[in-house]
Amino acid sequence: MPDELTEPGRATPARASSFLIENLLAAEAKGAGRATQGDGSREDEEEDDDDPEDEDAEQARRRRLQRRRQLLAGTGPGGEARARALLGPGALGLGPRPPPGPGPPFALGCGGAARWYPRAHGGYGGGLSPDTSDRDSPETGEEMGRAEGAWPRGPGPGAVQREAAELAARGPAAGTEEASELAEVPAAAGETRGGVGVGGGRKKKTRTVFSRSQVFQLESTFDLKRYLSSAERAGLAASLQLTETQVKIWFQNRRNKWKRQLAAELEAASLSPPGAQRLVRVPVLYHESPPAAAAAGPPATLPFPLAPAAPAPPPPLLGFSGALAYPLAAFPAAASVPFLRAQMPGLV
């Protein structure tokens, strides 16, 4: 009778062992305990009765147990293929692992477990358990990114040396060329943003500065005529040594200013109280006695006293043929100097 197969002492399963491996090991331990009890009872029975059928059944059971151990250890004929088919490729580190998927480093089905515990070594019974360093400290994101090729690598020392050699070959003019290129980039970016650059923005239009004589001549012409024809504008521009566009713009600005002044005066007149703007002439109640009456003697006394004579009103600024007089402030349009001046015909 062959010697019974005894299992060596099993160590505590590693923390990195998968749930499936732990279940298989637990089932194996239970089967081994039952096999040991069955072997003792069968030995007693074999001592009493040597039955060849019981011996064949025991050998078949032992062969099944051996195949299970080989399956867990990944040894024996077809053991690796069966382990891969049962536990998935790369789960036990049997052979090369498949490339990780595009998912996050710890997602299931994307090689996360293989990247978490990439290295394994042989343990009890030819089994596999993760390395202690891998079990205690997972890989950092940088190492996983390098393994997957997701992060670009920086330039090595060779690239720096090549760039230094190129700059040395180009000479001192290389620095000025690079500076000019860098200066052109913000300028081009400013032009693309609607012509607003970083330095000064849009081009500011130059403002024409008129001399005192030119302003006096322009003001005099404006007092006579608000709008100029093309011939008058050309003659005035030639006499003042200005362009027709400059004369035209000056007249436009001057007309706008004149309109604003008129609007302000009308608004001030509408806000002032109307009683202060109207003056009424009071008729004289009595006249002085003529010289003949004065020589005859004083007039007879009246039974009632006469009211004192009202003071004479101030002379009106602008008189009319009626009994009423109004001050000039009642007519703000007439108060302006240009209104009093004669207007030339031909207004546009």
Curated annotation (Swiss-Prot):
Composition-biased stretches (Basic residues): 61-70
GO cellular component, one term: chromatin
Pro residues bias (residue ranges): 96-105
Keyword Disulfide bond: no
Main location: nucleus
Lyase as UniProt keyword: no
Motif interval(s): HMX family specific domain 1: 263-273
Gene3D superfamilies: Homeodomain-like
GO biological process: negative regulation of DNA-templated transcription; regulation of transcription by RNA polymerase II
Motif annotated as HMX family specific domain 2, chain positions: 276-289
InterPro entries according to UniProt: HD, HD_metazoa, HMX_Homeobox_TF, Homeobox_CS, Homeodomain-like_sf
Low complexity biased stretches: 166-175
Summary of the function given for this chain in its UniProt record: DNA-binding protein that binds to the 5'-CAAG-3' core sequence. May function as a transcriptional repressor. Seems to act as a transcriptional antagonist of NKX2-5. May play an important role in the development of craniofacial structures such as the eye and ear.
Disease tied to this entry: Oculoauricular syndrome: A syndrome characterized by microphthalmia, microcornea, anterior segment dysgenesis, cataract, ocular coloboma, retinal pigment epithelium abnormalities, rod-cone dystrophy, and anomalies of the external ear.
Full protein name: Homeobox protein HMX1
